Structure formats: C-alpha cells, structure tokens
C-alpha cells in the first residue's frame, strides 16, 4: 500500500471511530423506542441514504460491475447479518444501561482484529502483540473465575464487528456500493417487521411527533457515515493497523457513560478494563515503535 492510501485510511479511520464514540448520545435521545424498531429504521433509512449518495456521486457503474460477481453479493449478505446483529446488540446495550460494557467490547475489538488478521490473512504476530492478546484473554478469564460473570455483550460486539471487518477486507468491495448491497439484503426483513409486526407506541410514524420521526430518519446518517469511513479505511489499511484506532470510540463511550449517564463500573468490570487497557497500551507502544523503526 502506498503512502497516499495509508494517509487516507488513517483519516477515514479517525473519523469513523470518533463518530461511533459519540453515537450513544444519539441513541439515548430515542431510548424509549424499542431496540428492534430502531434497528429497522437504521436499515431502511440507511438504504435510502445510500441510494441518494450513489446517485449524487454517480457510482452506479460500481454496482453494475459488482452484480457480475455473485460470490461477492453472497459474501455481502454474510457481512450484512454480522453488522445487523452488531447494530441490534449495541442499541440494546446503550439504552439498557450497558454502555460501559459496550465500550469494553470495542476496547477488546482491536485485539480480536489482530487474531483474525493472523488466522485468516496471514499477518504475523510480533512478540508484544502476543503479550497484548494474552493479557486481554486473562482479563476476561479473571472476571469469569473471580466474579463468576462473563462480559457477553462486550464479547458479542467485539467478535461480530471484527468478523465484519474481516469479511469486508476479504471482499474488497468499494465502500458505498458494499453498504448499499448490505442494507438491500436487510431491507425486506426490516420493512416487514416495522410495518407488519412491530406494535408499540412509536412503531407508527404517522402518529409520531415530527421531532421523533426526524430523529429516526437521522439513524440512516448516523449509521452510514461512520460505517462508510470504516469500510473505506479497511480497504486502505492492514486489519491489524486498523485496530490501532479502535481505542478512540470506546474511550469516548466510557467517558459518556461515566460522566453523563451515571453508569458506575463494578469491581468485575474494572478488573477486565484494567487488563484491556494495559494490553492496548502495549499494543499501541509496539505499533509506534515498529512504525518508527521501519520508517528509518
């Protein structure tokens, strides 16, 4: 990868993780809407937002080319399921006072990226990366052994998003086109659920206040902008390098949870956080050292 691509990837990754970091504040505004309904709005409005964006950017030629490769279309169905599950779990966690555990999941994610990069992409571990991964595993095991609890939400978010990044990396599809196909795969299920199954005080848009409807429509923008930045970054950076930026989002989530939303980490969570933070510190220092050494 050339220097220009790397610089673009860095900027895109920074933008993606910053927006993701403050995204919980948006979902807190619509906390009274069921998580499954918010998910359907994310899918539906993301699809239409992508159609408009593709038209403005005149990128329909990419879609025509992609349609000629059915294998990639099928793999985008797999990535759609992964990201859809990740979205649902994240929304539920934020609006059910588990923002801290959600942030833990995204702290763990960079280390999962390293493991997947080694297993599926042939990326080699350095010794310090091994140490970081082992410390992260120890943090989860200590919580399980000492406190008898397992950070299910955190692990679910970490692994679903890591596998999503891996699949998108392997497919190597242009970011906007891939996002359009993913939401197109999810659209029928989302539409059927919202208009035929969902039955709550907020499921009928014709009866909702305009302010709520605008917030629900905004789910498309909140969803697609950072995800487009992420998928574009994933095609320009090594998966392990992409993991370097992941700490930005969960740090912002952690600060939001503790400072603005009154969540207090218990002893079990703090033990795991401590291990993960030390692991990430080692990972970051190793990445900086390696980058400086190779640039000489």
UniProtKB/Swiss-Prot annotation:
Signal peptide: none
Residue stretches making up the EamA domain: 18-145
Segments crossing the lipid bilayer: 12-34, 38-60, 73-95, 100-122, 129-146, 150-167, 180-197, 212-234, 239-261, 271-290
Pfam family membership, one: EamA
UniProt membrane topology term: Multi-pass membrane protein
Annotated disulfide bonds: none
Gene Ontology cellular component list: membrane; plasma membrane
Membrane topology, Cytoplasmic segments: 1-11, 61-72, 123-128, 168-179, 235-238, 291-296
Principal location: membrane
Topological domains annotated Periplasmic: 35-37, 96-99, 147-149, 198-211, 262-270
UniProt family annotation: Belongs to the EamA transporter family.
Protein name: Protein RarD
Taxonomic classification: Bacteria, Pseudomonadati, Pseudomonadota, Gammaproteobacteria, Enterobacterales
Gene name of the record: rarD
